[in-house]
């Protein structure tokens, strides 16, 4: 003891007495706490880690580095052995101390032996540096520095000096070891560096300060980022496939809890249990560092108050400040790293599971809007809501600590803040009861609006032809306003919750000080205030997060409800196993190719007493029993709504309600299925045909020839690489059907199921396709395939091997071979067909080049690239003030002024009390405590009121105003965009504007804007308070704020791009989702569900990359700002301790610093969120300004409502082109273009004349209808060459033109599901109920209305068959004519019909023509028709087109008799 001079070195202490300036720990304390305890824990953890790594294979090279590490570690171990020998043999109590010193040295040597093994295993078998080893080395270095100081202070003898020297040498080697262990091993990994993220090889320190993101920031600052080239890949654990498997297993384990609340939440927690727990340790550490602040403030104020304290204590306080605030920064960084990682793993789990469940669902349970909203909006709200998930348990710990420590300062008065908190909890709980319900209602409104908008985008052509764009546009805008109104009810609750959340932090100090009996001085005021701040700040954050957390659980419940919907059950039965060779339905030697007309053979598919329906109340097919022969062609015919499409779906196992048996060879074999409405994806023609199959050039060319697609591809600028647009919008109806048929034929299968796929083809093209595919030498016969073709084309019946005739009541009327049914049946004899027709038809061969005319809409890929690319460039522009101006122009000025003024008042109310407490502590005004408490309460009340006013102005008024105007702006742009825009622009990208971007404007943008305004004024007010306590620190403000400004500029360059990439990466994900929903029957029939799930996972992984990196980038910013606050805090302490400043103002500064760092971080983050959220406004602005309108300046003429009265149409010398270079009308330079849709067109139609447009597929028939409706523009110098009833066509406003002309599209359109029969029939609401009922009766749909109760009942479009939809669409046209006649007593007008009878049988076609003949007797009619018998019977004139030219006009009856005429050739083909 004599050597050390200390009285307690051999006791636990921990502080020494009587030596080393009384500023050191005792040796026993150092041996136990700084040596033995951490070493023992490390050895235990290290051995466990070595055992884990022992079973892994070697994945890292770098043997030179590994040898260097081991050499340094061995040298350190040797020195540790020397220290053990010295401590064991020394007689000096200063070194030996007691037996704990020897134990410490022994453990020190042992731990380095273990370190040797751990380093060896970690280097070769783990991708990143050892977290256990590097953390322990850092800790040990810090602890050893303390011990080293003690030894050198004791160095009064050779033995002690020798021990201290060796100990110092070990510290140097430990530093070297730490630096070596921190070396990144990416260059030595055995994997490809390009396939992995730097995150996977980063050390814990690298992750903690987000240094692994530097590459992203550097690239983002220099150039425009792209996802595939610049963004890091996701690591293995975040891959969607891995996450999906985890959630699937976890969710399946709780199958007994179906329908119970929180089932999905619990399953998600189990699936991500490790990522969920990892943030706990740094969060606990953060609590410790935060609660060290009040003790630190207490120590600092005591130091400043007592002038006789040793100066060393001041240095200790500076060191303590460094440790505390650095600890807060690092623990916060690590917490958010692990937490954000967990959140995006949850996103991957949920999004992939929703998609997979969608592919398993029944067709009736899958709706575009609802399911897409689950995958997009609901999942995003879950991630947003769970940001504060760990705060709930952490806040309980913090509240308990805060109450305990506050009680020690204020006595029983600590209860008063608890009362305030409990009252706020009660208020928040009461509000929370309504949050879930109001949010659900709001989300339902969003679903409906997005669903209708997506329907508009996909059906814009038919909507414009129908002339109902305006009422549909008004309906969408009305739904948007209702959505905002419902959303405001939810937002009011958010404002109330936010206001209540700030009450504890604002009013608790006032209440606590008012009720305390303690004597309040500077020390007690500021220490108590710091405890209250730590007690109430977490509660404020928690209260604010309550609505978001509740919303997250509501969204989880919505997703769970969807996931628990009973999946589609394949009720079909297999009769024999799948062939192992290629998945075909036929056994390899089962059948030989059979000739035509050999009759039925072995049954491939059987239905026994089957009944099938789409609702439980009504069966579409009843009691049917059929057999489908192998290797044969079976035709299914029947009247409209007899159930032909349902028959196809029944064979696929897709009808939700069924009875009886459906027997197939194998339920796992693919079926080449073609839907009646072709399902095509937004991709190239080649991609649509091949899909997920392996490319086989021979098979591919064979299919192109069979479907007559070669000529179509030859005239396209990019051939089969041409992008066809969403829903194949750039293709004609017949071309869509042939591409769909080509996909089915390309599939490796022996069974084709074709649902009326030839209805959109002219007779000659249809016959040739039929011959090439189903004829005696057709592709189907050569493959010995079995085919079922549902059709209205009775001319093919003699070619069938087997015929199934469905009756109107959904039963099988007759079935058998053609010969059998012709002899004994009822249906066939009435058709006038004979077997002789077979030979003449099948032997005729039309050359391919004559079958398909070389005129079609040309894909405008250049336009697509320019428009979308321009939107991206506009969105990524840095600091575009025009975007902010555009946003603020959409809101009222008074709301903006209210926001700014209330923000200033909030900052004053929140921060002035800190200065006031300094005056109070020194009693500057010589008044009682009540005076100071009263003034403090006044300012805190001002804070709460100002917050409420600011939130109301931004979240309610600004959101509502901007939401209406911005949506209306882009909606008008959408409905007025030229048709060319829709043929080339990605469906998902446009839908994303109305879903994701609108969600940002309604939700994230106003909240971020509110917080930014609040934080701007708050930060500047805090800066004033800090400067009052440390005036010299104010000198550094320009430097500090310059650093922050440069940081945010550097940061924003990248974060803005990441946010936009995040939004853009979701577009293909959502588009694919919608494609899957539309084509789910095709996907499942062709057994491509697994491939589609994998493709979805690839898209999800792609969308995760920018979203995850953006979240990490935001935490990088927060960490950097926390480190800046650390520097400021150390500066305040240094100035205060060295200059001995006023204790009251020093307390103000430190108390303010406790929140200032968080406020600065929040300001930058909120401002960044505003910047990236304003990107949504930028995209909307760019969309509205850069997407041209189809309306031109001179089109301002609005004819009288009764126009046209006569129907006189004159088209003289007009050519038209689908322009691809700009949005101006096509110019005369295009006249020689080979891509002219119409060339030198002259058609004169007299009033009341009935004109049919005929010609082969692609000849330009539909283009004339589009021309008359201004959906296709004539060349610019010919726009005056079209006149209707004397009115110059080029002057009439386009939307008015389409309302005045009555047109019926080929593809009927309906209002969103749930709209009434009357609303669909009369979108303009100008007809009476009686008129609507009369029209329904005339089009034979009265029963449909009666089944629903009334015409005001809501309907779904899929309740109608394809034929019924056409009749309904015709009924809409009839109603418009009758209303016009009632209002204006006008009998004449113009009716345009685009192949309206393509989806109906001959009987229904005759009904359609009779209705047209009777209703539109005085109208001029222009109709596209492939059914020439109708033309012969009902039309006065026919216009025959070929390759966009009029090649013949005249009376169809005369032309049919004229030998060699174009029409006579078509008529001859029709007769065959």
UniProtKB/Swiss-Prot annotation:
Residues 605-834, 1218-1468 form the ABC transporter domain. Pfam families: ABC_membrane, ABC_tran, TMD0_ABC. GO terms for cellular component: plasma membrane. The keyword Cell cycle does not apply. It is found in: Cell membrane. GO terms for molecular function: ABC-type transporter activity; ATP binding; ATP hydrolysis activity. Residues 284-551, 900-1139 form the ABC transmembrane type-1 domain. It is a multi-pass membrane protein. Its main location: membrane. ATP binds at residues 638-645, 1255-1262. It comes from the Eukaryota. Glycans are attached at residues 682, 696, 763, 784, 843, 1101, 1277, 1293. Induction: Expression is positively regulated by the cluster-specific transcription factor FGM4 and is induced during infection of coleoptiles of wheat seedlings. The fusaoctaxin A gene cluster is silenced by H3K27 trimethylation by the histone methyltransferase KMT6. Keywords: ATP-binding, Cell membrane, Glycoprotein, Hydrolase, Membrane, Nucleotide-binding, Phosphoprotein, Repeat, Transmembrane, Transmembrane helix, Transport. The keyword Glycoprotein applies. Pathway: Secondary metabolite biosynthesis. Gene3D superfamilies: ABC transporter type 1, transmembrane domain, P-loop containing nucleotide triphosphate hydrolases. Disruption phenotype: Leads to reduced virulence. Results in a substantial increase of fusaoctaxin A, and abolishes the production of fusapentaxin A and fusatrixin A. PANTHER family: ABC MULTIDRUG TRANSPORTER (EUROFUNG), ATP-BINDING CASSETTE SUB-FAMILY C. ABC transporter; part of the Fg3_54/C64 gene cluster that mediates the biosynthesis of the octapeptide fusaoctaxin A, a virulence factor that is required for cell-to-cell invasiveness of plant host. The 2 nonribosomal peptide synthetases NRPS9 and NRPS5 form an assembly line which likely utilizes GABA as a starter unit (loaded on the unique module M1 of NRPS9) and sequentially incorporates seven extender units composed of the residues L-Ala, L-allo-Ile, L-Ser, L-Val, L-Ser, L-Leu and L-Leu, respectively. Belongs to the ABC transporter superfamily. ABCC family. Conjugate transporter (TC 3.A.1.208) subfamily. This is ABC transporter FGM5. It comes from Gibberella zeae (strain ATCC MYA-4620 / CBS 123657 / FGSC 9075 / NRRL 31084 / PH-1) (Wheat head blight fungus). The gene is FGM5.
